[in-house]
């Protein structure tokens, strides 16, 4: 096996570094002389920023710390490669660098846009008769990648969201006062993360009263009527909402607070924020309730201290599966997770066509959403509950979790 190049792209997760560990250890086991890391993704490679991971991952303790370190160890980017037919320069530059470092396989850990990068690199490689293998490794807390049962990163984010919301529910019940709490959860176009709030429910907690997802347009009057009903029934009403919920006119609720915000290279609004504040103000003004808005923000994507062991394990497995696929000669593929059963929960990895993943989004199935569009049902529970099981204990130093950094 020739040398290997691996990068991380897009938003970080609590387990993206476990996938990096899977790529690194499997590549070394398969005989790769060097495993190079892209510093700051494909953008960093274009600037010649590579690191030999053998120099920074010296022993088993480093690997164990890597699995427990949140965010992207190598750094990330949101750089969109152009169509090579329009601008071939970056491709010429990249393939010259691949030749210089004797790269035989490139692995990119990321979401939809990262799979677009793998798709373009593999297609260009074919046109220039390159033997380099290009494989995608799935990563996103949004859980919106096609052709995989679920995406590494989601289980840990879901576990964090359910746990924190459960604690918010406890906190909201402290005083003998009626109130409505609105918790804003990430999710630009899909509601997988907000739906995870339902996992707070159990024998000691009822979970959130309402969950609003981008999959259903927001009906203001129906929403207010339901909140009014709930407010009469109980002291504290808890609402979970995706940041990307839109009204019937297709306008983000957060844009009704502010229209400010830049777009990233892929045409996405860089920051969605304000949905919970909009709803809290709406309820306060229209219903006269005491309200509070909470944004989980970036905390939900990097809480490695509360990571799902299932998620950590599967993240490592898809990294290893990607390398094994490259060794077999596969390219233009993504390592995916296939669910075999729920009881007991069992999965296996498989390789899927990356072109069928890039630039597509998987939404929460309509049949998993309640008829009124303001909650999820037991079908979601059966799907998501296995993904948050078990814990990976942090390695502590001075009373706080220890991490590893470049």
Predicted regions mapped to residue ranges:
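N-terminal phosphate-binding or glycine-rich loops at protein starts, especially the Walker A/P-loop
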Residues: 1-50
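Short glycine-rich or small-residue beta-strand-to-loop segments that form or flank ligand, phosphate
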Residues: 3-11, 72-78, 104-110, 136, ...
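Short, ordered loop/turn segments at secondary-structure junctions
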Residues: 9-11, 38-44, 78-79, 111-112, ...
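Short glycine/serine/threonine-rich phosphate/pyrophosphate-binding segments
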Residues: 13-23, 45-46, 89-92, 112-120, ...
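Accessory alpha-helical/coil subdomains and C-terminal extensions
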Residues: 35, 97, 105-110, 116-128, ...
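Glycine-rich oxoanion-binding loops at beta->alpha junctions
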Residues: 48-104, 113, 152-154, 166
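C-terminal non-catalytic interaction/assembly regions of soluble proteins
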Residues: 252-406
